[in-house]
Structure formats: structure tokens, C-alpha cells
Amino acid sequence: MSQAAPAVRPLPAVYAPVTERVGPATLVRGPIGPVESALRLGLGLAWTGLCTLGFLVVLIALLPSRVARINVGNVYGSFVGKGCAWLTGSRYLIHNRAAAHAERPAIYVANHASLIDIFLGAWLSPMNLCGVAKKEIIYYPFFGQFFWLAGHLRIDRGDRGKAVASLKALADIVKKNALSIFIWPEGTRSKDGRLRPFKKGAFHLALSTGLPIVPMVIAGSHKAWEARSLRLSREQVDITVLPPIDTSGWTKETLDEHIREVEAVFAAALPEDQRPLAAAEPARRAA
């Protein structure tokens, strides 16, 4: 028989106290049936569509200004993301959210193991932030088209030259307009929830902009909504915003070392079942 989960499950000591909660106060963990899963996902799609239509008028009026559109996208993301998270039926505990609203721009990086992570990132991102996602996000109903129209960046992971050029252009826009960036450093979703080696794109952005890196650690989302599945499960998902990592002393020569340091920060903050296995590190893509 399923048991009610404790208010906060045991997590690594780096986790700050809970500052926000979305979802049931008392959680009974376990799979959600196919009919209820379909209903919840359908309601999530309907909520996303409703928000898209509501914000689209504002977005069209601001087409001449990319920065203004980016900010409309940030507000839109907070509505869509929080609503979709609530509709999954899981409980989301936010730790140290204030760290995601620092006055200084930053590069926010998060691990990625579930489709719901995209909505969590959209919900918790501060204003004046440009998101970076794979080009295929355009095919996500409503959300992907709005992401593109709002001026956020889509990159072609299959074409390194184009990806690098896009990130260089983004660095110029960020420096000119004092924007933050949100990027998934693993480059793709983890199939089993375990942390994957980070690609270099986010860290080249740190070098070219001088912005600090703010880790956003997501624990448990791979159980709430498994990768490549339409079945949901009632789980507890913890999202912690960790203190910023200064990048002002980074150089190209020490970049690989700094990437490993940031990976270690994530690994230490994740539960044991999401830490990378002790195995040889796969080769990184240059981008």
C-alpha cells in the first residue's frame, strides 16, 4: 500500500529550506492511470493554448523589440510552467528561489531528465532572460511557437557551425541588453535521470559574457514524467537554486576543468539515483 510522503524527502545537505510549494500538501506516491494521465496532459495542453492566445496579442504588438518580446515570454512562461506543473499531480518544492532573481544577469543552467523540466525552467526563470533550446522545440504545441516568436534562441544541435554562430550572436545580445541566459548544459534529456556530461556551449557563453553561472538542480522529475512516455506518476520534485559560480577568472585553457567543477556541484546536490555512474567520461562535443 502507498504511504504518504514526508513534507521534505531526504536530500543532500546543500539544499536550502523550502520557499515555495506547488501541488498537494499530502502526497501519496505512485503511478497515475492512463486515463487520468491523458486527462491531465490534455488539460496542460489546453492551459498552454489558452495562455498562448492571451499573450499573443501583446507579443504581436511588441514585434519590433526583441528584448520586450523576450520579457513577455518570461511572464508567459511563469504562467504556463506553474500551471502545467500543478496539473501533473506531483508536488514541487522550490528551495532558495530568491537566488534566481538576483539583480545581476547570470547564466542559469539546469539538469534535464523529463519534459516537465522545460516548464519548470520557464516558471522559475527571472525576467530579462533569454532561453536556449534545441531547434525542435518549435514542434511543441503552442509553447514552442511562442518560444520562437518571443525571440528566444533555438539552436541546431546537428550543425556545430550554426550552433556556435548562434551562441556567439546571443552573447552579443546579452552583453548589449544586460540579459540573463537559461540553457540545458547536458544538451539532451537523460533517459534514466542520471546526470550526463555537460557540453561546452554554456561555458563558452560564460567566457564571452563574464556572467556568473547559477546552477538550478532538479531532482525527481524523471519519476514524475518519464522520458518518452505519456504516463505520469505522483512524485515529489525538488528544485534548488544554488549560489552563483564566479566565472571572471576562467580561461579557454582551464575551461574543461571548470566544466568538471560545475558537474561536481550538480552531482553533489542530486540524490544518489541521479548522480552519474563511476565510469569513463564520454567524449564531449566541442559545442
Question: Positions of the model-derived regions?
Answer:
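A generic structural signal for well-ordered alpha-helical segments
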Residues: C84-A85, F147, V174, A206
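Generic preference for hydrophobic
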Residues: I94, Y108, G131, I239-V241
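Catalytic core of membrane glycerolipid acyltransferases/transacylases, capturing the structured
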Residues: T52-N74, S78-F79, A85-T88, A100-R160
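Non-catalytic C-terminal accessory region of glycerolipid acyltransferases
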Residues: M1-P31, V35-A38, V164-A287
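A generic local structural motif
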Residues: Y92-N96, I116-I118, L167-A169, W225-A227
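Membrane-anchoring hydrophobic helices of lipid-metabolizing enzymes
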Residues: S2-A106, A287
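Conserved beta-strand termini and adjacent loop/short-helix elements that scaffold enzyme active sites
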Residues: H95-R97, K134, I155-R157, L242-P244, ...
